[in-house]
Amino acid sequence: MEPLPKQFYQCSTIELTEKLLGKCFVRILPNGTRLAGRIVETEAYLGEGDEACHAWRSRTPRNEIMFREAGTLYVYFTYGAHYMLNIVSEPEERAGAVLIRAMEPLEGIEFMQQQRNTTKFPNLMSGPGKLTQALAIERSCNGRTLFDGEFFVADAPAIPSHQIGTSGRIGISRSTELPWRKFIMGNAHVSGGKVGGVVSSLQ
């Protein structure tokens, strides 16, 4: 698996939510174990015009990472229980990020099962909190990049537009009308939960 170049991430946040679908997120642990998952669900968050985005009101120490180079990891703790994995987008100094909502496990399955304390395959990474637990992603990963060797996204065939679903984002109370959740339709690893807006294909 070869890492995607920096140029891949140099696009709008909305475009990146679709481009990332089907690509492989990889983490190489210090002991050499490789963990990999196919990205099957994403959500866009923008600093401008999006009240659900952490950077909507202002730049703060907490959201500072969102203003960095596209391809930087923005990891935060939420609900007192889960870490969320985001990939920074947009040009530097303009906040934006793609939340990785779900993956399909590809490599390192046994490690993931131990991390998640479950052997149920479809349940290993079928949600943003589940996938970070499976990948052992925590606060120390915040600010890392996809270009330093430990983390990267590998290329894979693009998902045809008629196989991409779109809907409102899950688990938010503001800007719910924005159709910025993208997912591979029919994939068993896409997360559940209450959806804001209508689910449809992009065709």
UniProtKB/Swiss-Prot annotation:
NCBIfam families: 3mg, PRK00802.1-3. PANTHER family: DNA-3-METHYLADENINE GLYCOSYLASE. The keyword DNA damage applies. Disulfide bonds: none annotated. It comes from Chlorobium chlorochromatii (strain CaD3). One of its GO terms (molecular function) is alkylbase DNA N-glycosylase activity. Belongs to the DNA glycosylase MPG family. CDD domains: AAG. GO terms for biological process: base-excision repair. Keywords: DNA damage, DNA repair, Hydrolase. It is an enzyme of class 3 (hydrolase). This is Putative 3-methyladenine DNA glycosylase. Pfam families: Pur_DNA_glyco. It comes from the Bacteria. The keyword DNA damage applies. Its EC number is 3.2.2.-.
